[in-house]
Curated annotation (Swiss-Prot):
Disulphide-bridged cysteine pairs: 125-141
Record organism: Rickettsia prowazekii (strain Madrid E)
Family matches, as InterPro entries: Rieske_2Fe-2S (IPR017941), Rieske_2Fe-2S_sf (IPR036922), Rieske_Fe-S_prot (IPR014349), Rieske_Fe-S_prot_C (IPR005805), TAT_signal (IPR006311), TAT_signal_bac_arc (IPR019546), Ubiq_cytC_Rdtase_Fe-S_su_TAT (IPR019470), Ubiquinol_cyt_c_Rdtase_Fe-S-su (IPR006317)
Name the record gives this protein: Ubiquinol-cytochrome c reductase iron-sulfur subunit
SUBUNIT field: The main subunits of complex b-c1 are: cytochrome b, cytochrome c1 and the Rieske protein.
Predominant localisation class: membrane
Signal peptide (UniProt feature, chain positions): none
Listed cofactors: [2Fe-2S] cluster
Length: 177
């Protein structure tokens, strides 16, 4: 090999390194320049504060379901009877399309309160409460039936009614979101 060929290989390698380094610095600079623009798409603090709601449970009678709106979605809040709780806990997991124990769907110590997102998991219709074979919810669009724990028992719905994030602020008040 001649000195000229060795020099070309070294220059090519050196050139590749310089191009790679310059490209990396440019990419990091572009990311830093665009970060404020990307970050502006996140919701502001006042919008995040409105993303949670507080619901007073004291006016909901035993056996009654109330619907509230949270983030544009209907939320079913049900004050279940002892019979509804016992029936939901007696169901065998093998009978469920989407097996989930009743105890997992409610907060410990507040077994009578069931909070679910009121949207059918099949195609997004709003089910009717205290309807159907299982005394839970019935979706009039395609016939999905949910039990008193919001678990799908029959029909085309693949999943149980979703449980939104919520906490008990007191025995008679919850915060959803």
């Amino acid at each position: 090999m001649s000195d000229t060929e060795d020099n070309k290989n070294k220059q090519t390698t050196r050139r590749d390194f310089i191009v790679l380094t310059a490209s990396s610095v440019a990419a990091v600079g572009a990311a830093c320049a665009f970060w404020p623009i990307i970050d502006s798409f996140n919701p502001s603090a006042d919008v995040l504060a409105l993303s949670s709601i507080e619901v007073d449970l004291s006016n909901i009678a035993i056996g009654q379901t109330v619907t509230v709106k949270w983030q544009g979605k209907p939320i079913f809040i049900t004050n279940r009877t002892h019979d509804e709780i016992a029936a939901a806990r007696a169901v065998k997991m093998s009978e469920l399309i989407d097996p989930e124990r009743d105890e997992v769907r409610v907060k410990a110590g507040h077994d009578n309160w069931l909070v679910t997102i009121g949207i059918c998991t099949h195609l997004g219709c709003v089910p009717l409460s205290h309807k159907g074979e299982y005394n839970g919810w019935f979706c009039p669009c395609h016939g999905s039936q949910y039990d008193s724990s919001g678990r799908v028992r029959k029909g085309p719905a693949p999943l149980n009614l979703a449980v939104p994030p919520y906490i008990f602020i007191s025995d008679k008040k919850i915060r959803i979101g």
